[in-house]
Amino acid sequence: MTFDENISRILVKDKEYEMPFSKGLLARSLTAAGMKPSESYTLAREIERDLNEQNVLKISKDELRRRVYYTLINRDYEGIGEKYLLWRRVLKKHSIIILVGGSSGVGTSTIAFELASRLGIPSVIGTDSIREVMRRSISKDLVPMLYESSYTAWTALRRSQWDEQDTKEMHLLGFERHVEPVLLGIESIIDRSLTEGTSVIIEGTHIVPGLMGEKYQSMPNVIFLNLTLSSEETHKKRFTARAKVSDRPLERYLENFEIIKEINQYIVEKSKENKVPVIENVSISETVQKCLEIVTERFSNLNDEPIIDSDMY
């Protein structure tokens, strides 16, 4: 029997659907659990080879996970095996909401999409998109700060407020007024995800610990992460790189860089006050790994079953 080498003849069965076995998907899951990418793909290829040699044409997702786990154990990857099963089990039973915050240019969208890919979470929502939705329901006359960028929102404050604040306080007050209506949209998405049992990653400048509802801080399946960049040079280079692949004007960011720095420091301080992890996002791979470690620790608190069921072979 012949088959396309790029499309596996092995079907993986779930309750509602069947799909071809994917070495790439399995390798991604193993990498998320801490295995090196090259090793994860090699192991995924070996598992596919073993299934073909045993003439397995259909296999349930649970059975495949058992095989992967015991293969990892036999290769002395016990820790990775436990993480692999933990993530699959928790994501199957619980809705997971990961909130990735940070000021403009620190890389929240990049890290959010990397985490979504590793964890198999299908939905990533940027807070800029939520802001656009809120603009359609709230008039500019009512909340003019919403119609500005996070770092220019202070210019929409009433003139009387300018006299009451020093410059930095005015910048941060404008930022807070800009963020507040967007938080309503963020909280609505979280509530809906929890109700419907779906997982989502939300990323962007508008995620500020301490400004969101307190109830979310105590929810074990709502995970806050904050990214930062201490190096001004690195931060500015991120804006330069962004300008090359988007229509966002570099000059606008650089002209307002001092305010962006103030906002960054404000979010970091709020994160520390609320015991939210602050991660220096210099290396994407290292940041993703640190985030995954934090997420794994939270997953452990959600998992109320032994890693391996007693009926596993």
From Swiss-Prot:
Pathway: Thermoadapter biosynthesis; cyclic 2,3-diphosphoglycerate biosynthesis; cyclic 2,3-diphosphoglycerate from 2-phospho-D-glycerate: step 1/2. Its EC number is 2.7.2.16. It comes from the Archaea. Keywords: ATP-binding, Kinase, Nucleotide-binding, Transferase. Catalyzes the phosphorylation of 2-phosphoglycerate to 2,3-diphosphoglycerate. Involved in the biosynthesis of cyclic 2,3-bisphosphoglycerate, a thermoprotectant. NCBIfam families: PRK04220.1. This is 2-phosphoglycerate kinase.
